[in-house]
Amino acid sequence: MNGLLLSGGSDISPEFLRQDVPDPSVLDKQIDPERDRWEFQAVQNALSRGLPILAICKGLQVFNVGLGGTLKLDIQGHNLPEQKQRDVQPLRSARGASHRFPKVNSAHHQAIDQLGDDLEVEAWAAHDGIIEQVRLRKYPFGLAVQYHPERSRIYDALFKDFFARLESTKK
């Protein structure tokens, strides 16, 4: 393994969350505990080896929870059909953000609540502050995004950066 790419998917199984789930009905019905177990272990393995990590959508949530963070288990207004394919969610970016996009195609019903250890917010939704991009401090390449960069060419720089890091780990 030269790096780790965590993709989107169903909600994290409650057994892996570091918080109470007062209303289990807000969680997806297609949770996959085996996938979750594998992903949490893969995060720990990648971190212990200093490998590049790119986490997307659910992947960001796994990355955050794996580092001790918690989630907002059901948010309103971020899972609208028009947000899935078009870049409609205005962002605010931190001054030192590694990748900046004015708008993203964010569509999800969960998000980061409490940040995991050593994560730093790089971008958040302009209208409600939902965290959309984080990076792992003092780590060669640990980037996680709530939006879907695989859906548009405007995010190519993010993938090029990740793949360049993968190539450098082969040497």
Give the ranges of each region predicted by the language model.
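Structured adenosyl-cofactor binding patch, chiefly the S-adenosyl-L-methionine
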Residues: 63-64
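Flexible gly/pro-rich beta->alpha loop and the following alpha-helix that scaffold active-site loops
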Residues: 1-54, 67-68, 72
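Catalytic nucleophile loop
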Residues: 60
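Conserved G/P- and acidic residue-centered "switch" motifs that form tight phosphate/ATP-binding loops
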Residues: 57
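Amide-donor transfer/coupling interface in amidating biosynthetic enzymes
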Residues: 1-7, 35-51, 76-171
